[in-house]
């Protein structure tokens, strides 16, 4: 009788214990939850950042700032925003601690609404630079964490695609905060701008809450293991990563900056000012949709080919689509310009999804923070060099000069893509 009871108790115990399949499903659900939390963080964060970005120039101008001062401030901010990413990536790899940098970086967004509480230009400049430094601190470790979460049966492409889509929703909604304030108050003076900044306080609170929740779930259930294995040795940084960085430089250098497109459409009278901003918003929507589609395609290619680096095949979309942007967006036709900006949105979505996903498939996790830091610096340098060159060429030779420049740069990117694809197989 005792033996029979023991067998029954053991059977009940085994039934009560969750199966390995159930545990795996539970882990995947937690990962999806964290990925969605990070998506909300990106969305809310961009509401704060892009909202302020749409108003900073006008607000500083009302307080007496010069164009030279704004140019130097923005240039310095972008320099810190990209250069320090290499430092933060290196720190998180050396220490194995990603979350302090992520939380501190997003926490720095609190300085943005505080910009509405002062009219001192020196203080405002300091707050602006703190926000840029905060973004540099958080981006490499955040991307590193997301890249490993994506390996939990979700897919790197779709994870970064979802992040970009929600990011663009925030980028679209952010400026609407100030637009709503202006429409409601019927004013565009200093007080109106300060009210707009004040409305960003609760959004910052949502950012912090979402980040802390993500941190709690990841650390409690150990969803990210420091020093976990990543790509295989034959697909590591020493073999392919430098070649990928060369591709990144030329691909980003060949992307026409929207500032040049907007300048052309305005100076040539192709479309009205309101239509320019509307088309830019449409391009951001296209960006969000393209990010999801190309991200999913990236994962599908990897699964079908059965090789970790197979997703790199989708990189061909970047040089192919980038070449068409100047010939459409810098034309004299409103319809062609609209098509060009839609193509511009596709390129941006691919940049933010596939190019970031590829880092995860080319590097081991313990070096991924540094890899993302290097990627961001190279990307920023390429975009800066390309935009500067295209601006000079447009002033001297107009749209044809920019088109020729893009052709050369993206042709180089395509040749590097071919070599990269061969090395990755």
Identify the function of each model-found stretch.
Residues 6-32, 216-247:
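Juxtamembrane intracellular "pre-TM" segments in multi-pass secondary transporters
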Residues 84-96, 182, 290-308, 394-395:
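Helix-to-loop junctions at the C-terminal end of transmembrane segments
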Residues 307-355:
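C-terminal transmembrane helical hairpin of 12-TM major facilitator-type secondary transporters
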Residues 127-169:
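Cytoplasmic helix-loop-helix junction between adjacent transmembrane helices
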Residues 100-114, 310-327, 407:
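Structural signature of the two symmetry-related core transmembrane helices
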Residues 195-214, 401-418:
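Symmetry-related core transmembrane helices of the 12-TM Major Facilitator Superfamily/SLC fold
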Residues 23-78, 243-269, 276-279:
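Helix-loop boundary and gating motifs at the non-cytosolic
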Residues 72-90, 281-294:
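Central cavity-lining transmembrane alpha-helices of secondary-active solute carriers
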């Amino acid at each position: 009788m005792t033996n029979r009871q023991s067998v029954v108790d053991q059977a009940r115990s085994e039934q009560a214990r969750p199966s390995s399949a159930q545990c795996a499903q539970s882990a995947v659900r937690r990962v999806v939850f964290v990925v969605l939390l990070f998506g909300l963080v990106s969305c809310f964060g961009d509401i704060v950042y892009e909202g302020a970005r749409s108003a900073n120039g006008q607000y500083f101008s009302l307080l007496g700032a010069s164009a030279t001062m704004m140019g130097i401030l923005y240039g310095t901010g972008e320099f810190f925003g990209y250069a320090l990413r290499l430092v933060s990536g290196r720190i998180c790899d050396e220490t194995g601690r990603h979350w302090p940098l992520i939380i501190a970086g997003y926490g720095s967004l609190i300085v943005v609404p505080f910009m509405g509480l002062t009219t001192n230009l020196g203080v405002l400049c300091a707050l602006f630079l703190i926000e840029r430094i905060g973004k540099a601190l958080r981006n490499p470790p955040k991307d590193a964490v997301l890249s490993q979460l994506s390996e939990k049966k979700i897919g790197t492409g779709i994870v970064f695609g979802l992040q970009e889509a929600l990011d663009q929703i925030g980028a679209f909604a952010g400026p609407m905060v100030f637009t709503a304030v202006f429409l409601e108050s019927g004013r565009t003076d200093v007080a109106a701008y300060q009210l707009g900044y004040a409305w960003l306080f609760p959004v910052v609170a949502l950012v912090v809450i979402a980040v802390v929740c993500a941190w709690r779930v990841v650390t409690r259930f150990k969803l990210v293991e420091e020093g976990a294995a990543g790509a295989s040795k034959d697909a590591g940084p020493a073999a392919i990563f430098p070649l990928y960085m060369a591709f990144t430089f030329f691909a980003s250098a060949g992307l026409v900056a929207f500032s040049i497109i907007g300048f052309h459409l305005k100076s040539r009278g192709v479309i009205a000012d309101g239509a320019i901003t509307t088309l830019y918003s449409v391009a951001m929507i296209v960006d969000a949709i393209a990010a999801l589609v190309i991200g999913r395609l990236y994962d599908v290619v990897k699964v079908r080919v059965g090789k970790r680096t197979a997703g790199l095949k989708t990189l061909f979309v970047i040089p192919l689509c980038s070449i068409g942007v100047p010939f459409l967006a810098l034309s004299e036709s409103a319809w062609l310009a609209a098509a060009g900006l839609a193509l511009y949105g596709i390129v941006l979505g691919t940049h933010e999804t596939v190019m970031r996903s590829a880092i995860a498939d080319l590097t081991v996790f313990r070096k991924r923070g540094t890899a993302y830091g290097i990627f961001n610096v190279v990307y920023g340098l390429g975009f800066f060099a390309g935009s500067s060159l295209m601006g000079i060429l447009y002033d001297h030779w107009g749209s044809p000069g920019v088109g020729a420049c893009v052709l050369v740069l993206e042709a180089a990117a395509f040749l590097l893509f071919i070599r990269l694809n061969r090395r990755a197989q």
